[in-house]
Curated annotation (Swiss-Prot):
GO CC entries: cytosol; endoplasmic reticulum; Golgi apparatus; nucleus; spindle pole centrosome
PANTHER family: UBX DOMAIN CONTAINING PROTEIN, UBX DOMAIN-CONTAINING PROTEIN 2B
Official protein name in the record: UBX domain-containing protein 2B
Subcellular localization: Nucleus; Cytoplasm, Cytosol; Endoplasmic reticulum; Golgi apparatus
Species name: Rattus norvegicus (Rat)
Amino acid sequence: MAEGGGAEPEEQERRSSRPRPPSARDLQLALAELYEDEMKCKSSKPDRSTATAFKSPRTPPLRLYSGDQEYGGLHIAQPPTGKIVNELFKEAREHGAVPLNEATRSSSDDKAKSFTGGGYRLGSSFYKRSEYIYGENQLQDVQILLRLWSNGFSLDDGELRPYSDPTNAQFLESVKRGEIPLELQRLVHGSQVSLDMEDHQDQEYIKPRLRFKAFSGEGQKLGSLTPEIVSTPSSPEEEDKSILNAAVLIDDSVPTTKIQIRLADGSRLIQRFNSTHRILDVRDFIVQSRPEFATTDFILVTSFPSKELTDESVTLQDADILNTVILQQLK
């Protein structure tokens, strides 16, 4: 009896030391880990159906593209040696940044596209998800350069914007989320924006020297209180098509300026005015050029930052809108 009693606890101990069969919970965890490993392997392989198919002998920059016609497009490019605002680039990368061939940045074969191939349509908010779009839908209208300095950032050749300013912090937060900043959305009604980022973290802001840009086509110089239009028609014929002089009397003895007007329907007008013309003259020009707005109640606002031009008796020079873009908004 004593020996039998001693053997029974040993048998129970051997049974308890045997591995128990896996439960349903164990199987679920194992499958989840297997799935995660498989997805990591897939994500490490280039997908030829997206912009990652564009390769470069060197480490390519990162670029994020948004082709939403309502909110415009957003490109984020980081130079290979970039060390600035690592978190900014990291979070942008998480919202769809893809490597692109550096050569596509300087290609001028197709003026309507900044690169060939697909990109990502970025949501304008948390609720609007990003999605892949194809190259034929990528349009470019306004190109903006965001330079990140050690003491702030600048847009194109504009003034320094300190990081400590809450408005500027909000701008960068939108970029980090892969969204088009609100102040740029106001510029792209019916068109698109290309936003490139340059790394200057090791330098303090350097005010650029004024210079003329020799290129054919249109663009905008952003960053000051109001953007400047940089427009160089490739031929007199094109200039005649883009600038309507019939509706406005020009005094050649007085300085002139070009105003681009983005209409509420998404179209735009470019007109040459004297600096002494008034805001009311701009309104009259819109109505003469587009009679359908004669019975429409609308306002005129500056584009960057947005400010309503309430006093229409003010001259264009006094309103500080020479060589700028103004927007028509329906009431």
